[in-house]
């Protein structure tokens, strides 16, 4: 069987990994073996955190809505329940933005939900 030299293929594979590892500290960005490990870990973290980001933002929005709702004398769960009963279709992201950017409008949303 003939010998197969992996010149082009191996070099392209290594350069792809090193290109992904650009900006990593020390040998993690310049030596192939350590760069390969760091890139694999970075890709795993990125995959996991893309899903975690959705949870984190939802928690942040809920915390902001709860804080603003309590200023208006109602708890978060009561507010969300009242909004559903009043058929006010506004999502948590928009409610949180209203609470931060325009508290008067948020207060009017709360009063419309109460009545």
Curated annotation (Swiss-Prot):
UniProt xrefs under InterPro entries: Ribosomal_bL20, RIBOSOMAL_L20_CS, Ribosomal_protein_bL20_C
GO biological process: ribosomal large subunit assembly; translation
Keywords assigned: Ribonucleoprotein, Ribosomal protein, RNA-binding, rRNA-binding
Pfam families: Ribosomal_L20
Cited CDD domains: Ribosomal_L20 (cd07026)
This protein's GO CC annotations: ribonucleoprotein complex; ribosome
GO MF entries: rRNA binding; structural constituent of ribosome
Family indicated by similarity: Belongs to the bacterial ribosomal protein bL20 family.
Record function comment: Binds directly to 23S ribosomal RNA and is necessary for the in vitro assembly process of the 50S ribosomal subunit. It is not involved in the protein synthesizing functions of that subunit.
Protein name, UniProt field: Large ribosomal subunit protein bL20
Organism name: Prochlorococcus marinus (strain MIT 9303)
């Amino acid at each position: 069987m003939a010998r197969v030299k992996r010149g082009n293929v191996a070099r392209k594979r290594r350069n792809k990994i090193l290109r992904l590892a650009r900006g990593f500290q020390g040998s993690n960005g310049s030596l192939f073996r350590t760069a390969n490990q760091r890139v694999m870990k970075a890709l795993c973290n990125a995959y996991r955190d893309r899903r975690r980001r959705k949870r984190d933002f939802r928690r942040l929005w809920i915390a902001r809505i709860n804080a603003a709702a309590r200023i208006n004398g109602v708890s978060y769960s009561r507010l969300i329940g009242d909004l559903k009963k009043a058929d006010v279709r506004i999502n948590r992201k928009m409610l949180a933005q209203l609470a931060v950017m325009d508290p008067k409008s948020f207060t009017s949303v709360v009063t419309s939900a109460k009545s």
